From Swiss-Prot:
Gene Ontology biological process: negative regulation of DNA-templated transcription
Origin organism lineage: Bacteria, Bacillati, Bacillota, Bacilli, Bacillales
Organism: Bacillus subtilis (strain 168)
Protein name: Copper-sensing transcriptional repressor CsoR
Annotated spans, Disordered: 1-22
Subcellular location: Cytoplasm
Pfam families recorded: Trns_repr_metal (PF02583)
Main location: cytoplasm
Binding site for Cu cation: C45, H70, C74
This protein's encoding gene: csoR
Sequence similarity: Belongs to the CsoR family.
């Protein structure tokens, strides 16, 4: 059975939206490198944990944005084209994985 997402891309995203997501991820990458430096420099564990929590929150925000965008565009388009059942099933699977974290 072919997966719904094998041929899908972020085509519906504007260049500005892609840049915003990329910039968010680059900031998160910088935060993670900062955490790595904190560990290497034997910083206080609580300070490191606070930074890890901030990274987790930032990643969750990016994921929520992508999840919302996917529902509004990809899933909605699939429903309109008659392929909604598979798209909804895929969305629910992703949502279940997302809520486990």
């Amino acid at each position: 059975m072919e997966k719904h997402n094998e041929h899908k891309t972020l085509n519906h995203k504007s260049s500005k939206e892609k840049d915003q997501i990329t910039n968010r991820l680059k900031r998160i990458e910088g935060q993670v490198r900062g955490i790595q430096n904190m560990v290497e420099n034997d910083r206080y564990c609580v300070d490191i944990l606070v930074q890890i929590s901030a990274v987790q929150a930032a990643m969750k925000n990016v994921a929520l944005h992508l999840l919302e965008d996917h529902a509004h565009h990809c899933v909605a388009d699939a429903i309109k084209s008659g392929d909604g059942e598979q798209a909804i099933s895929e969305l629910l699977d992703v949502f279940k994985k997302f809520t486990k974290s």
